[in-house]
């Protein structure tokens, strides 16, 4: 009984991070941890601090000066810190210094991540009861067993959290996300991509009541990735925009229910957006581009790939008002022609990356406008552009010397044209489907 009571107060086993058949638990290594496999699940025990013993004579602890010079980015990851804590009592105390735990990173589909987070945060809260004041980043992407319980643990224990990534954790819901953004006021980076139950980002009702009518500005999120949150609708986007007014990076890839109306809400509240993706949002049209154009010179990155309702009209809105655009992905927007490329090239002369693949109405004429205006172009994708020939490529290569990537797969271009590009753009990597060109 006494042994069991000691275990509940101590070090998380590395088995919380890795199942028994992982490399760290093969060939007898890691045998000091208590773990067992039951019906394919890892059952991790929590151990007491190891007894004090002499460290290995070849192991030297860093001096105070060396510690001050250490690069925080080189700290061991979560699983290695847990293993270090098993070496001896001194290493145990060093490994659990809260200053080493600015980041928790857990990976794996089978890991019991809810339990792992509970044990880790409980240990890190011992010096500052109930809160982990040093923890700023939690990354549990791909941990499919994460549930609302795990997010509640983070919300309750990590008030200084700045970055949370739960990509692919499809069991979490709006309520748990609301708790995190309400109890972690410094949260700036949130990745809930692939979390299909998440349809909104908002403060909890209790938190909203305590704040002023402008409580939406209390959410400090700047980076929000909701890729593949395919249940998100315009009303949800309206709520997100009203609460997250400081957004600078927003990714809505494959949020297929979003329409131009949702983008109108977004532009009312979020006027600082620099990067925006609405790729594969098939209901977004030229009217949506008119709304996005209200970002004007602040917009640097835009992805509208496979938005089939966007034509030259929408491109003209962007080109006219967003003159500092650096990246545009318009792949699969089959309504774009040489006229749209002309508007873009003449107004967005600082363009560095352009993808107009699968735009069959873009020809060598459009490439000529690019070549004569966008000298800083570094990446150009023309994949499956049926109207492109070697002549257009040669014009681009003769003017855009800094070109680093060119995709002409499934284009009817000659070997001579590809060799011309290679001669003029020395650093260019050419992706092609011409077997005669090496």
List where the protein language model places each region.
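CRL adaptor-proximal regions
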Residues: 1-68, 437-438
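F-box-proximal linker/hinge
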Residues: 47, 55, 59, 106-157
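The Skp1-binding helix-loop-helix core of N-terminal F-box domains in SCF E3 ubiquitin ligase adaptors
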Residues: 69-81, 98-99
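Short helix-loop-helix/strand-helix junction enriched in hydrophobic and basic residues
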Residues: 81-98
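Conserved hydrophobic beta-strand positions in leucine-rich repeat
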Residues: 104-106, 133-141, 162-167, 190-193, ...
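Short, solvent-exposed loop/turn at the beta-strand->alpha-helix junction
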Residues: 110-117, 144-149, 170-175, 196-204, ...
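A structural signal for leucine-rich repeat
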Residues: 118-123, 151-157, 177-184, 200-217, ...
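C-terminal interaction modules of eukaryotic adaptor/scaffold proteins
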Residues: 373-438
